[in-house]
Amino acid sequence: MGLFLFIASGCASINYNEIAPNANTFQPKVAVVLPAIKMPEGTEHDIDKVAMAIFDAATTAKRFERVIDPLTAKSQMSNDVDLQNAIMVYTSKLRSVGFSDKESILKIGKIFQADTIIVGEVSKWGYGVYAGEKNGEVGMAIKMVDVATGVIYWKAAHTDKETYHLFKPNLAKMATKLAKKIFDYIPKP
């Protein structure tokens, strides 16, 4: 019975999955995972781990010919003030008012020579006790944006928990597993 429940929960869908009407016809070739990941307060030191988890999932999904990793993007940002400003303007507008700023996304896409921008956000990251059980918990949302139009053509989110007794689960490994689960729902052509 326990094995059946484990298998059934492993096949469960994700909490949120929204696909734009044209997403199945969009044929992106190059994606960049932005290093500007929103994290819960006090956990910013894990940003690179989450960005790499999203990169690994995007690469594994095999939806793109090439995926630019967030550490390369971060390095390029540190050398290019225009890129840094474009990413900060874009992500702040996206998070504060839900607006995908076409001017900023075009700059980002042109600099990286990418046709898709992947933006991540972490809603939960840590350990806690719920109903007497100790858990590690990671919650993540991923958005993919068409550079040419500025339209968010896919967004999805999910949260996973792992119960533990003695050893805390590795949150970075949980994030990688969670990102791959979310990318299982990426629109296919």
Language-model segments: residues:
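Solvent-exposed loop/turn segments at secondary-structure junctions
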Residues: 38-41, 73-76, 123-127, 160-163
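C-terminal/domain-edge helix-coil "capping" segments
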Residues: 11-31, 52, 57, 62, ...
